[in-house]
Amino acid sequence: MLMTTTTIAMSLSHDVIIAAAQRAARAIPPLWPLASSVAVNPFLGQASEPLEVAAARLRRASGIAVTMPRSWYAERLQSGEITEDDLQAAFQTAPAARRPPNVSALKHAIKVARPAPQAIPTVAELARDVTAIDWPGIVNERIGHWAAGYFDQGQALWAVGQSGGAYSTWRIIATHDLTPEIAGLAGFSQSVSDAPATAEDALVDCVARLGLSPDALDGYFHRLLTTLGGWGQVARYRLWQAELNGGTDACVTDLLAIRMLWEAALLHNGGSALVPGWQSAIAAYAAPVAASSDDVVDSILQEAAERAAQRKLNTVLAAPSSARLSRGRLTLQMAFCIDVRSEVFRRALESLDSGITTLGFAGFFGFGIGHRRFASDVVEARLPVLLSPGVVTCAGEPTPAANAAELSARITARAKRAWGRFKLAAISSFAFVEATGPIYIAKLLRDGLALARHHAPTDPAPRPAHELDLDTRLTMAARILKAMSFTSNFARLVVLAGHGAKVVNNPHASALHCGACGGYSGEVNARLLASLLNDHQVRAGLAERGIVIPADTLFLAALHDTTTDAVTLFADDHPSPTHAQDLAQVTQWLAAAGALARGERALRLPRANRSQDIAHRARDWAEIRPEWALAGCQAFIAAPRSRSAGRDLAGRAFLHDYDWRCDHGFGVLELILTAPVVVASWISLQYYGSTVAPERFGAGNKLLHNVTGGIGVVEGNGGILRTGLPWQSVHDGERLIHEPLRLSVLIEAPTEAIGAILERHPQLRALFDNRWLHLFALDDEGRMARRYIGDLSWETYVGDASSQSNRASTLA
């Protein structure tokens, strides 16, 4: 017996259904391909609602919890890490109508395990329960098999054509795929053949066949997209990129239509046995999303854990600083990315000499570029993913010698690609190992024993593909220096350090690079800025604008390898014999700082008994934790460096230099809040999601990963595309390395200025109002003075009341 199409479903208009599909598309996050992967907030579609409501929504859509098990909070309460005051303060922030009657009741609730989260069932899941056939697994396997070819970015030798869109391409393949019918879904190929020709019409048809009510559409569509795992997010990425360039993309709608055709066919095939369960599911999808009392309890516990961490952070910032700063002219100023990994190296470097100071700025250094590497036609977007490239750059000067070198490199690259395809081809691959295996013995031994050596980037110095006029260069230089709060007191040597990570056998290698550079290493942007600021015409123009750079100041670019803490200086870009002694001294300092940083990081890395083990890990094919990347991140501080210098923040804080007294009109503050803070929130929440819900927001086990399509990874031989971070990125095998805490943003600026910016940017304000981020204003001494409580309101922050003598000096 088939489900009778209801009058309500038949009356649903095309526009109503498509609008619901578009809303569902925005409820899931995008997924960037592996070559340029960046951290993405998995809760991007839920930023407009608080944690407890998002928990209710994602439980229905994905069957997950978005906070840690209650035992995790109970342990912290018992150890004293979470205090009674933290619990009481968190309790007061919860809506009075839904929280427990008092803190005693809350403490009792901690001892009671919350119910296991259950998603509202799909037709495939109901059919599995009735027939004992794993229909959800079959659906995921068949869609994944097709999607791996359709979305392929060069890995497959025989790529699936993309003309006509995802829906049309899938129909062509599905009408010839007998797997569903062999599994028991009779007539599936014919039903696909008979389906409407367009995805939108197919959606409308399936809504009627499934008997969906208007109120059920959003929840059901969201549920289906989550069952697709990373494939839905790849389609969402396409929509993101299209909208960034002023267009649109229908791939998410196509995938939703594909998934709904499976649902409609399964309902038709299941007959009356599925009707009662499906009617109950429709009613559940149509019910309003509302937080349960358990959701509110979990939200309060999460808030309490974060308040405990904030109290500890305030103690560190309020403690006396051990920093020593020269009263004369500085010898070295070194600008780093705000990435938390830089904090360890910066602290180590500054400890070596009072003539050294460091700065923090977004790692793309204000250059929003699309860069074409040497001997490549691929334009890499080396800037935050929230932005579009404004300048196209390339490597090397257009000289005859450079052109000849590029041609030679292109020929070599083509030969390597041809050889690689020959190795993987359907016929030649069988004989390849037997015929050429001995040739690879030396390489296999070298790589297998981690004897290979990493080499610094060798691309020629980058330049704009089309020469920029002086006024444009001047405007760029002034804007960047002001954004860095770096307009005076220049040292003889200023080093601009981008960062990257050199690892082997790691599909997620780009995730270890600079997020502000779009998942690429940051040396290109740093080299461009150094060239710009060494330009004599630019310096003369800057002086007329009040930014005087001494004639003996030299800007150099560098690359900080976050895996080994080695630093490469690009001194040959701007040779200066008069700075030879300075460079020799700086080289020694960088080597010493690297040793200190490696020693500190070795304490956290498993099986890294000595700092010398760090470099070996970067070359080891079998190493699943070459570095901890941004695990542990919990704070973003925008203030003068003096507020954090000499204080051990344990590699857990993003540090952005900012002096509001020099920011007339607060344009720089607005830029910080709308760009670096948002990028940092994406990073923080990706780590949070991969920790609290690894089954949905994590990439699974690295040991089982197979790269598919050059896009992402699957576990084993197929199925859904995994997203987020591998479990080994947040867990050391015995305990969690990343504490799942929402980011605390600390800004030294007047609250009136911060509030005005939040009022102008509703999406940014929603992150703070719904406490996906915490916001604090620092006073003139760098202490946490005011807490943002939502609705453009602030309260006085009362931190640790203990005496200065009892204060800790580290955040670890």
UniProtKB/Swiss-Prot annotation:
Q: Name one GO cellular component term.
A: plasma membrane
Highest taxon, organism lineage: Bacteria
Main location class: membrane
A GO molecular-function term, please? zinc ion binding
Residues involved in Zn(2+) binding: C337, D339, H499, C514
Subcellular localization(s) per the UniProt record: Cell inner membrane
Family statement drawn from the similarity comment of this UniProt entry: Belongs to the inorganic carbon transporter (TC 9.A.2) DabA family.
Role noted for this protein: Part of an energy-coupled inorganic carbon pump.
Question: What's the protein called, per UniProt?
Answer: Probable inorganic carbon transporter subunit DabA
What is the protein's species of origin? Xanthomonas oryzae pv. oryzae (strain PXO99A)
The gene for this chain is: dabA
